[in-house]
């Protein structure tokens, strides 16, 4: 009886915590579809009484946003592929106990987690490499994340060495072992870290502001910020972007949040199984 009561209390607490996490996002979605009067009169909306697409029409009324979506998709796909390729190769090398200089290299990796190069030095390096106003400026400076690298390294390190020894007996070299044995066995970790990198690239904001001067190359996050600024009357007017009078600023902000968040949420269910397993194994074996 006591155990059942305890379980009910735990489930009740978890349900309440889940509602606290989910309700704000439901409010954001509902408010983005609500009418002007409802947004102004109500503080919290779960289901709009009258659906309105004015905010979304306003956001998608210009071709610029479609270009920005393509830019974000390109940066996310290419950036994730580059980051996973470089991170997995480096993590595999650091996971080998026979690697000469392994400890000093690991120290340098951990050091970058505590002390970064700084905004201005990084900008000067990007400028000297001729990457300003280039999509690669959004990818290469952050291609390897030290935290993600350590997770992959710990995962690779726990793969039984007997598998590698058997592969070597069969004539497999190091690259063959990596691509044919290590990577297939590491799909949960690969899926987890890929999602981490993809979310980071999709939310690219500060680096785009620093390195991109051409508005035609803006990713979706920067353009949505500009739409919010224009709609609130802080600078310019929307006629320059090919749109008429805007709906209320509150609904535009809510619609912007939905547009920026939904793509990531659509990807997550397809890798949920691998993501949960990879996160669990990383926490136990790390």
Swiss-Prot record:
Q: Which UniProt keywords apply?
A: Cell membrane, Membrane, Sugar transport, Transmembrane, Transmembrane helix, Transport
Q: Which organism is it from?
A: Bacillus subtilis (strain 168)
Q: What is this protein called?
A: Polygalacturonan/rhamnogalacturonan transport system permease protein YtcP
Membrane-spanning parts: 9-29, 69-89, 106-126, 131-151, 176-196, 251-271
Q: Which family does it belong to?
A: Belongs to the binding-protein-dependent transport system permease family. CysTW subfamily.
- Subcellular localization: Cell membrane
Q: Which GO terms describe its cellular component?
A: plasma membrane
Q: Which domain of life is it from?
A: Bacteria
Oligomeric form and interacting partners: The complex is probably composed of two ATP-binding proteins (MsmX), two transmembrane proteins (YtcP and YteP) and a solute-binding protein (YtcQ).
Q: Which GO terms describe its biological process?
A: transmembrane transport
A Pfam family matched in the record: BPD_transp_1
InterPro entries xref list: MetI-like, MetI-like_sf
Protein's membrane topology = Multi-pass membrane protein
Q: What does this protein do?
A: Involved in pectin degradation. Part of the ABC transporter complex YtcQP-YteP involved in the uptake of polygalacturonan and rhamnogalacturonan type I. Responsible for the translocation of the substrate across the membrane.
Which positions fall inside the ABC transmembrane type-1 domain? Answer: 69-271
